[in-house]
């Protein structure tokens, strides 16, 4: 093998090319690779952060939905309680009104009974006097008639 100046010149050119590449070409390539690596890492971190925020948002939405359901159920229960209370109040008022009407009707009936008794006493007394008059076949004077009526009323 013949080592001559060409081989030596090729080695010098290769070393110059390696030095030039290391000095001027390699740093921008490394920087570009580092920037790309950093962008990828930032993107992955942002994706993880977004995923965590999405999960947190889902949890908040689930909690708010559960709260809304609970509030709705509570409102329905309150409305049912109010409806039952109103129904009970209406029922109580109706019963009180019915009792009042019944008491009023009983009082009116009692008054009518008393009035009818008084009327009947008067009619019975008049009939008794008339019957007594017919039996005695004589005229009874007014004072005797009044006394007889009062006496018959008292007896009845």
Curated annotation (Swiss-Prot):
GO terms for cellular component: plasma membrane; proton-transporting ATP synthase complex. It comes from the Bacteria. The chain crosses the membrane at residues 7-29. It is a single-pass membrane protein. Pfam families: ATP-synt_B. Keywords: ATP synthesis, Cell inner membrane, Cell membrane, CF(0), Hydrogen ion transport, Ion transport, Membrane, Transmembrane, Transmembrane helix, Transport. It is found in: Cell inner membrane. InterPro entries: ATP_synth_B-like_membr_sf (IPR028987), ATP_synth_b/b'su_bac/chlpt (IPR002146), ATP_synth_F0_bsu_bac (IPR005864), ATP_synthase_B_chain (IPR050059). Gene3D superfamilies: 6.10.250.1580. GO terms for molecular function: proton-transporting ATP synthase activity, rotational mechanism; proton-transporting ATPase activity, rotational mechanism. Its main location: membrane. F(1)F(0) ATP synthase produces ATP from ADP in the presence of a proton or sodium gradient. F-type ATPases consist of two structural domains, F(1) containing the extramembraneous catalytic core and F(0) containing the membrane proton channel, linked together by a central stalk and a peripheral stalk. During catalysis, ATP synthesis in the catalytic domain of F(1) is coupled via a rotary mechanism of the central stalk subunits to proton translocation. Component of the F(0) channel, it forms part of the peripheral stalk, linking F(1) to F(0). PANTHER family: ATP SYNTHASE SUBUNIT B, ATP SYNTHASE SUBUNIT B', CHLOROPLASTIC. Belongs to the ATPase B chain family. F-type ATPases have 2 components, F(1) - the catalytic core - and F(0) - the membrane proton channel. F(1) has five subunits: alpha(3), beta(3), gamma(1), delta(1), epsilon(1). F(0) has three main subunits: a(1), b(2) and c(10-14). The alpha and beta chains form an alternating ring which encloses part of the gamma chain. F(1) is attached to F(0) by a central stalk formed by the gamma and epsilon chains, while a peripheral stalk is formed by the delta and b chains. This is ATP synthase subunit b.
